[in-house]
């Protein structure tokens, strides 16, 4: 069985192939490198909080490390991270890891690869074995927790009112879309095709805090980091629609781990 350190070394060596002559990654790739490190850290917190055994924690750790492996080649080829304009990055990541053979002969190979493959799907497949299911849910939760951080950082460090590139160039002053509001109220995943405004983009993350975070540990971490309060305040900058407080209040019990 390959150690996590050995797998990390292989991953880092692969990422290094995208560095320029100055030794630096392109800025958007560097963001993904940092994101991956944060997802790994989140996965470890979840595994500890949920009391996973060493075998399960190891599969979660490996899957978190590898979940976005394809992002670097995606940006190089297509100059975008938007899957609808390029490739499904989870499938791409799965295929690259498989092609590299990093997990060949590893008894957790299929569990880790499956977690990479489905980490961005709207729904988790049925019929997963316990190890795979734990890896899948942990990576999905850990990824969302860092996506919360990334959004907050983008809002704090960019002129989002005039350059909304990081948010798919969505309108910044339009009200939330009815389809998005309905999905959040019904506690079901939002269809990304229904995201029409920046308010929608932020509200889907509000919805995640109740129906998108699988583990109580993940919901506790989200609450401790103040992610819901940040989104409530930011949404008030985007719209005066009272639905903002309605939906944020709806999440509070779940974010507290209820």
Task: List each model region and its residues.
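Divalent metal-dependent phosphate-bond-processing catalytic cores, especially two-metal-ion Mg2+/Mn2+ enzymes
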Residues: 2, 28-33, 37, 41, ...
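An amphipathic alpha-helix signature
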Residues: 8-12, 40, 94, 98, ...
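Active-site flanking loop/helix segments enriched in acidic
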Residues: 11-38, 72-83
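Amphipathic, well-packed alpha-helical segments that form the structural scaffold of globular domains
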Residues: 19, 41-44, 70, 98, ...
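His-Asp-centered metal-binding catalytic motifs of divalent-metal-dependent phosphohydrolases/nucleases
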Residues: 57-82, 93, 111-122
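Post-HEXXH active-site segment of zinc metalloproteases
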Residues: 76-91, 157-161
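Sequence-structural signature of the catalytic-core scaffold of metal-dependent phosphohydrolases
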Residues: 87, 110-120, 131, 150
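A generic, well-ordered mixed alpha/beta core segment in the N-terminal half of proteins
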Residues: 88, 92-102, 116
């Amino acid at each position: 069985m390959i150690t996590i350190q050995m797998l990390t070394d292989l991953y880092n060596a692969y990422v290094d192939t995208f560095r320029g002559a100055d030794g630096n990654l392109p800025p958007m790739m560097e963001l993904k490198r940092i994101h991956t490190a944060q997802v790994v850290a989140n996965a470890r917190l979840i595994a500890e909080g949920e009391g996973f055994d060493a075998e399960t924690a190891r599969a979660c750790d490996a899957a978190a490390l590898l979940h976005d492996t394809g992002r670097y080649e995606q940006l190089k080829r297509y100059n975008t991270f938007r899957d609808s304009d390029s490739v499904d990055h989870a499938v791409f990541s799965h295929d690259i890891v498989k092609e590299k053979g990093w997990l060949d002969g590893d008894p957790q190979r299929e569990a880790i690869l499956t977690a990479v493959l489905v980490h961005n799907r709207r729904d988790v497949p049925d019929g997963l074995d316990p190890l795979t299911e734990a890896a899948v849910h942990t990576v999905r939760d850990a990824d969302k927790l860092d996506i919360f951080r990334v959004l907050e950082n983008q809002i704090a460090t960019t002129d989002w009112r005039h350059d909304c590139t990081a948010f798919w160039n969505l309108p910044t002053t339009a009200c939330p879309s009815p389809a998005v509001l309905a999905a959040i109220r019904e506690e079901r995943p939002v269809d990304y095709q229904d995201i029409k405004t920046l308010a929608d983009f932020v509200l889907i993350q509000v919805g995640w805090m109740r129906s998108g975070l699988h583990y109580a540990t993940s919901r506790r971490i989200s609450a401790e980091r103040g992610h819901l309060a940040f989104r409530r305040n930011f949404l008030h900058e985007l719209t005066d629609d009272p639905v903002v407080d309605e939906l944020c209040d709806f999440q509070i019990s779940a974010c507290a781990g209820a």
